[in-house]
């Protein structure tokens, strides 16, 4: 029981929950490099601010919904 009390009294780690520093030797983060193929760089997708919807877009969506509802409700 005294070991558990010591654990809880320590509080959260000061550097956060993620391991800091280089990865341990013998482990690859993206697998071993393949010979003859260049290593792929990570692809980052940049999300901009959402575009405002035009009146035409709104009307087309509304018409599609009305059409689908009419098809479903008629049967």
UniProtKB/Swiss-Prot annotation:
UniProt keyword Lyase, yes or no: no
Subcellular location: Cell membrane
InterPro entries: CYSTM_dom
Membrane topology designation: Lipid-anchor
Disulfide bonds: none
Stretches forming Sequence repeats: 4-13, 14-23, 24-33
Region annotation (Disordered) ranges: 1-43
Other observations noted: Present with 13100 molecules/cell in log phase SD medium.
The protein's name in its UniProt record: Lipid-anchored plasma membrane protein CPP2
Originating organism: Saccharomyces cerevisiae (strain ATCC 204508 / S288c) (Baker's yeast)
GN (gene name): CPP2
